[in-house]
Curated annotation (Swiss-Prot):
Recorded superkingdom: Bacteria
Keyword field: Amino-acid biosynthesis, Cytoplasm, NADP, Oxidoreductase, Proline biosynthesis
A Pfam family annotated for this UniProt entry: Aldedh
Reaction(s) this enzyme catalyzes, per UniProt: L-glutamate 5-semialdehyde + phosphate + NADP(+) = L-glutamyl 5-phosphate + NADPH + H(+)
Record function comment: Catalyzes the NADPH-dependent reduction of L-glutamate 5-phosphate into L-glutamate 5-semialdehyde and phosphate. The product spontaneously undergoes cyclization to form 1-pyrroline-5-carboxylate.
Compartments in which it is found: Cytoplasm
Protein name from the UniProt record: Gamma-glutamyl phosphate reductase
Organism of this sequence: Bacillus anthracis
PANTHER family noted in UniProt: DELTA-1-PYRROLINE-5-CARBOXYLATE SYNTHASE, GLUTAMATE SEMIALDEHYDE DEHYDROGENASE
Length: 414
């Protein structure tokens, strides 16, 4: 039996144990993981350094290296996230609804774990911690399959998690890592319907599209973040300038702006100043012919650029003559993640909210807030851009299903 199949079978067995664990037992395990991460920070960073060095040798971009890199503060941030997760209400066992039928049957809809969650993701070692702890909190066994670029970091983190779980009532195999990073292991994970209840891809568009296209296992799609901001002709200048920091504050994340859509009338007044401000921050602009006419240093955008999640300081710029044109462009090229409008015209804002198809829509605010903690709902395992079974930041309830519990006293159907 190969690694993937063996770990799938083990995860199915473990899932039946985890459903019996209390909230207190799960929280004790999370606390142990947080403590062990701090205790073994030096070991994790030593292994992460190997990934960074290999990445540099392979010519990884700065944005990819940033996603791959761990440091003491990022590990502290991970542990703080775990502590916040401990404080969140456990959804498992929650009664979603209850009613009584005329025949005396009492019916309850109860939250239960999904069972076995598969996570396939790219060069983000922090996802290893996020996925493991969120799954444990919700009583799910998890099989992790990261990328080859982060294999040293992922192996180290999972080893630390195992050492932590050994001190608790939760089985070490509640969290398992597929160490084979070849395409064959990924393809096998795609079709493990007998063992996986759901597969969650987290990464770039190519990875997500591949999983959605090839997996027979149910998929919770965490879409790429080709996010837009539309600056309407009525937009406040300073507000617009401030909100554009959604691109420059941390460009390598999925909720950063990738395309700036400018109303022509606003651009006539403030466009050149905006472009100059962005270039001072090291931004390389790619725009349409109208943008080029305003600033000759802008690179002409290709058709491919409009649909690209750059994950770097390279936004595209599109000039439009109406909100209808802006909405059409966003719905054509957007990834249904997060979209924003900056406007003082409430009628246009309402039209934007009704017409744009995305998980999160913003008025006069940055798209960078599409995040479980920023929404106030706590930890999330990704941002879903699909419409079933959940949309937007996927918090703890997203990793549960429901079942019906019916109590009677001898009723039969006649």
């Amino acid at each position: 039996m190969n690694e993937v199949l063996a770990k799938g079978k083990k995860a199915k067995e473990i899932a039946r144990e985890l459903v019996l664990k209390s909230t207190e037992q799960k929280n004790e395990a999370l606390s142990a993981i947080a403590d062990q991460l701090i205790l073994e920070t030096a070991y994790i960073l030593e292994e992460n350094k190997k990934d960074i060095e290999e990445g540099k040798a392979k010519g990884f971009s700065d944005s990819l290296l940033d996603r791959l890199m761990l440091n003491e503060q990022r590990i502290v941030d991970m542990t703080e996230g775990i502590k916040q997760l401990i404080e969140l209400r456990d959804p498992v066992g929650e009664c979603v609804s209850a009613w009584e039928r005329p025949n005396g049957l009492s019916i309850q809809e109860m939250r239960v774990p999904l069972g076995v969650v598969g996570m396939i993701y790219e060069a983000r070692p922090n996802v290893t911690v996020d996925a493991a702890t969120i799954c444990l909190k919700t009583g799910n066994a998890v099989i992790l399959r990261g990328s080859s670029s982060a294999i040293h970091s992922n192996k180290a983190i999972v080893a630390v998690i195992h050492r932590a779980l050994k001190q608790t009532s939760l089985p070490q195999e509640s969290v398992q890592l597929i160490e084979d990073t070849t395409r064959d292991s990924a393809k096998q994970l795609f079709t493990m319907n007998d063992y996986l209840d759901v597969l969650i891809p987290r990464g770039g568009k190519q990875l997500i599209d591949t999983v959605v296209r090839e997996a027979s296992v149910p998929v919770l799609e965490t879409g790429a973040g080709n996010c837009h901001v539309f600056i309407d002709e009525t937009a406040d200048k300073q507000m617009a300038f401030d909100i554009i920091n959604a691109k420059t504050q941390r460009p390598s994340v999925c909720n950063a702006i990738e395309t700036i859509v400018l109303h022509e009338k606003w651009a006539e007044q403030y466009g050149s100043e905006l472009f100059s401000s962005l270039k001072k921050r090291g931004v390389e602009l790619r725009g349409d012919q109208k943008a080029l006419a305003m600033d000759s240093t802008i690179v002409l955008a290709s058709e491919e650029d409009w649909g690209t999640e750059f994950l770097s300081l390279t936004p595209a710029v599109k000039l439009v003559s109406s909100i209808e044109e802006a909405i059409h462009h966003i719905n054509t090229y957007g990834s249904m993640h997060s979209e924003a409008i900056i406007s003082e015209n409430e009628e246009k804002v309402s039209k934007f909210f009704v017409s744009v198809d995305a998980a999160a829509l913003y008025h006069n605010a940055s798209t960078r807030f599409t995040d479980g903690s920023e929404f106030g709902s706590g930890a999330e395992i990704g941002i879903s851009t699909q419409k079933l079974h959940v949309r937007g930041p996927m918090g703890l309830p997203a990793l549960t299903s429901t079942k019906y519990v019916i109590r009677g006293n001898g009723q039969i159907r006649k």
